[in-house]
Regions:
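C-terminal edge beta-strand
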Residues: 280-293
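Surface-exposed loops/turns
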Residues: 209-211, 248, 260, 264-265, ...
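Extracellular acidic, Ser/Thr/Pro-rich low-complexity tracts
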Residues: 219-223, 235, 274-276
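N-terminal acidic, glycine/proline-rich low-complexity segments
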Residues: 1-214, 226, 230-240
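Exposed beta-strand face motif in extracellular beta-rich ectodomains
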Residues: 266-270
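Low-complexity "stalk/linker" and mucin-like segments enriched in Ser/Thr/Pro/Ala/Gly
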Residues: 200, 233-263
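Residue-level recognition of well-ordered beta-strand positions that form the cores
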Residues: 218, 232, 255-257, 271-273, ...
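Extracytoplasmic/periplasmic beta-strand context in beta-sandwich domains
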Residues: 229, 252, 286-288
Length: 294
């Protein structure tokens, strides 16, 4: 929202009542050349084969989706947009007048998303990232650095964030969610498409240090798919920085003991994640916020 001073020079002067939230960190690779930084497991989502099967072949919306070597150019004569061309070397593109500012990828492979990051936390996936910028979600979250770190060089700040505020990798669920929505756009019958699991249960609890809480949740799938359950801690969202686990991370009905060294007022964010075995796989989350009582 702040690219090219859009917020400072346009949005804020005209709509001063709008709330701005700045997110930090990368939880999913959507930028140019994201495939170069992706893990081995996530490489598939950027390949020409995956893009064709899951995006480009899905009706008129899929046909409009930009990929490398698609023969398109957003604005005719744009010397920075050489993405639609294929079969040329960097030197050959430069001779044609293009400014080759990023590496060339195979024809049909993933190109890039734009302002999608700004939208991801608005998707109702159960992470509730839109409720509070510190919660975090598919597009990351806001963290408040200690004063001793704020004045350090940027690289030192990034190192500190990585060590003390680890972020989840949401690449697979985001890309699968994108693929599912493209399929929805060409699937008239609800039963012929895959959908997210449904999770019901408490959103908040409170307990004293050392106290055990019973966690009971209902997890179902509208398509009757088999589900995989996983509990995990969203470390950067809570004020308690220690690592915690539930008794049975693979069960929707389990228990959790508040750490003995937790202080009154500390918060612990636990995420219950359900993943189905449909095609494409879809995820649903449920954020439980535990506040340590006196």
């Amino acid at each position: 929202g702040d690219q090219d001073d859009t917020y400072a020079r346009y949005i804020r002067p005209l709509w001063p009542e709008l709330r701005q939230m700045e997110m930090g960190g990368m939880t999913v690779g959507l930028a140019y050349n994201a495939q170069l930084r992706a893990s081995k497991e996530n490489q598939v989502f950027y390949s020409p084969e995956w893009m064709q099967e899951n995006i480009r072949s899905k009706g008129p919306f899929g046909e409009m989706y930009r990929v490398w070597g698609d023969g398109k150019q957003m604005v005719k004569g744009d010397k920075f947009d050489f993405f639609g061309l294929s079969g040329y070397t960097v030197d050959e593109l430069k001779k044609q007048g293009y400014v080759v500012w990023t590496g060339i990828q195979p024809k049909g492979s993933y190109l890039a998303e734009g302002d999608t990051y700004c939208f991801l936390n608005l998707i109702g996936n159960g992470l509730r990232g839109h409720e509070d910028p510190t919660y975090g979600g598919w597009c990351g979250g806001r963290t408040v650095l200690p004063d001793s770190v704020k004045n350090l060089p940027r690289m030192e700040q990034m190192k500190y964030r990585a060590e003390h505020y680890p972020l989840p990798d949401f690449t697979a669920p985001v890309m699968n969610g994108l693929a599912a929505r493209f399929k929805w756009s060409v699937t008239p019958n609800y039963a012929d498409a895959n959908h997210e699991p449904v999770i019901k249960g408490a959103l908040a609890m409170s307990a004293k240090p050392g106290e055990k809480l019973k966690l009971k949740y209902t997890v179902t799938d509208p398509d009757k798919d088999a589900l995989t359950i996983k509990w995990w801690q969203y470390v950067s969202a809570g004020t308690y920085r220690g690592k915690v686990t539930v008794d049975d991370p693979a069960s929707a009905n389990t228990a959790f003991t508040v750490p003995a060294d937790a202080n009154p007022g500390d918060t612990i964010h636990l995420i219950l994640e359900a993943t189905d075995n449909g095609t494409p796989q879809m995820n649903r989350y449920h954020r439980l916020i535990i506040t340590v009582a006196e």
